[in-house]
Amino acid sequence: MTNMRKTHPLMKIINESFIDLPTPSNISAWWNFGSLLGLCLVIQILTGLFLAMHYTSDTTTAFSSVTHICRDVNYGWLIRYMHANGASMFFICLFLHVGRGLYYGSYTFIETWNIGVLLLFTVMATAFMGYVLPWGQMSFWGATVITNLLSAIPYIGTTLVEWTWGGFSVDKATLTRFFAFHFILPFIVAALAVVHLLFLHETGSNNPIGLNSDVDKIPFHPYYTIKDALGFLLLILVLLMLVLFSPDLLGDPDNYTPANPLNTPPHIKPEWYFLFAYAILRSIPNKLGGVIALVLSILILALVPFLHNSKQRSMIFRPISQCLYWLLVADLLTLTWIGGQPVEHPFIIIGQIASILYFSIILILMPLASMLENKMLKW
């Protein structure tokens, strides 16, 4: 009798995706982050669901409802901090996942890559709206500053901002709609992740050397299910250490002060995972220019497949490109640091140099390095 997992319509899909999936035999731990992102999404949806049972999306009670969750709900503090720090783990995994794709040339799977860029935008939008919900000082002012950027769009800008706010300032209508969007978006992310996997399984996975691996495939289960399980354990360990030992390490102290439209915090800044983009936004002394640079800082990823002109897919045998890649990583870390600093000398100029370098590496230096490496191959 044929195994049910190979015949049953539903089980067959699961089988072909997670059990009998032919997988390259040499993929390293850098390929674990896809499944870790899946785990993060499940954690966020579950903790978020339980938080939504106790949260109220009204400006007068939002802050106290979060306090109530932490003080009065059974294990509410655990659920709240799992959700807040789970977002940080989500972004760490996201950045490493994208970084791996850039290093090993996974962006040549154009459909998979573009869905991935769309996923990145959606997750960033979800995280931004979630940050507004506790209705602390940084929630309110972060929402005000970031939504106000829409006013830089010529002609329709002001109307667009007021339409987003549901009034003439960030208020009750804004909070309610942000809660609604924050609830629905993770399910859209889950649907997009399925499409992401669908396109990936059309081509099969890439591997560290970037060569065709059809001659050497192994079944996903048990080899990579075990490997993923180890990743799950490590992720949960790090998350629990963060939640149980220093839950506020990555948060902002200002968010423990209820939102006050009459009192602006001295330094308005987003969560740490947006600081690199925030630094790029601030490095241009023009509102519209800054907004364009902000969007392009992420959208530039969609251009990467078209800028690839190397004869090799992976960077593993391309030392010049490797140097530029790690320069890009260092540059992003610099931008993250600058995004959290006040707007004064020398941070302004450092941010501007780092922003120029970020775009230069991706748009100019990497394609030039690839051309040089192609020439060196002929020698």
From Swiss-Prot:
Chief location: mitochondrion
Amino-acid positions noted as binding a ubiquinone in the UniProt annotation, renumbered to this chain: H201
Domain of life: Eukaryota
A cellular component annotation (GO) from this entry: mitochondrial inner membrane
Gene Ontology MF term list: metal ion binding; ubiquinol-cytochrome-c reductase activity
PANTHER family registered for this protein in UniProt: CYTOCHROME B
Further remarks about this protein from its record: Heme 1 (or BL or b562) is low-potential and absorbs at about 562 nm, and heme 2 (or BH or b566) is high-potential and absorbs at about 566 nm.
Subunit structure: The cytochrome bc1 complex contains 11 subunits: 3 respiratory subunits (MT-CYB, CYC1 and UQCRFS1), 2 core proteins (UQCRC1 and UQCRC2) and 6 low-molecular weight proteins (UQCRH/QCR6, UQCRB/QCR7, UQCRQ/QCR8, UQCR10/QCR9, UQCR11/QCR10 and a cleavage product of UQCRFS1). This cytochrome bc1 complex then forms a dimer.
Protein name: Cytochrome b
Protein encoded by which gene: MT-CYB
